[in-house]
Amino acid sequence: LSPTHWQASTFPMPFRSKITVVHDGIDTQAVAPNPAVSLTLNDNLVLTKQDEVITFVNRNLEPYRGYHVFMRALPEILKCRPGARILIVGADDVSYGARPRPEEHGGTKWKDIFAAEVRPQISEADWGRVYFLGNLPYQHFIPLLQLSTVHVYLTYPFVLSWSLLEAMSAGCAIVASDTQPLHEAVRHNETGKLVNFFNHEALAQQVCNLLDQPEERQRLGASARAFAQQHYDLHGVCLPQQLAWVNALRSSDSVVGEVKPKAPLA
């Protein structure tokens, strides 16, 4: 089994025809839009759907998932959206890529390295609208997605994060990197907006444009949720396909089991 067609395509040709593509699945009933959602930050700031919230989510904040590109887009986003709040989820370790080399990168954590790079371009007041939330418990993670006005997802050619599909299920308006694995889920102008991975200016512009277009955000979010339900729903789509795959293997084993063993050598 492979969860995505892109991952299946990375196997040598003789093996590809033997791979069945079935995603792990997400619970689209549990992760659904909630117009009444609210989230409290720092015990005193309550955010609702009336607020302008930009979300960026990773297990760890690292270049493999485009953290550096997102941070480089922040000065322009904060400048053009004076009321926006930036919610960044992720720890300060690495999950996939290499760790920074202090002698080359000036630090030991990607989170701090790229924050320090852009900090001189951002005023103290604007920096106060940027929130690093670390790793959130799941019961707080879902409201964060439901709260999002625009959700940003960036990645090198690599496996898709569950968080992207959960953002789609939550009805987020998504701006994502135009990298091959994403083409399976984020279709430009249908289920989201795609931008060049390395072009932080284009990312900032697309985010700001989308924040000015509530009807377009609604359309993209509804389309993204419908796509997630159709292709990635755990109970209605993925689990039945997984069980069918297992049953096919069991049937194959039963046939093999009926073959009589050869008589032992004398």
Question: Which residue ranges define each predicted feature?
Answer:
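A short, well-ordered alpha-helix in the C-terminal region of glycosyltransferases
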Residues: 202, 209, 216-231, 237, ...
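Conserved donor-binding/catalytic core segment of Leloir-type glycosyltransferases
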Residues: 1, 43-65, 71-76, 86-89
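Conserved acidic donor-binding segment of nucleotide-sugar-dependent glycosyltransferases
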Residues: 188-189, 193-200, 209-214
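Aromatic "clamp/platform" in nucleotide-sugar-dependent glycosyltransferases that forms part
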Residues: 156
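Short hydrophobic beta-strand element within catalytic cores of glycosyltransferases
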Residues: 173-176, 186
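C-terminal alpha-helical cap of glycosyltransferases
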Residues: 234-266
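Donor nucleotide-sugar binding/catalytic pocket of nucleotide-sugar-dependent glycosyltransferases
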Residues: 1-50
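Nucleotide-activated donor-binding/catalytic signature segment of Leloir-type glycosyltransferases, i.e.
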Residues: 90, 99-139
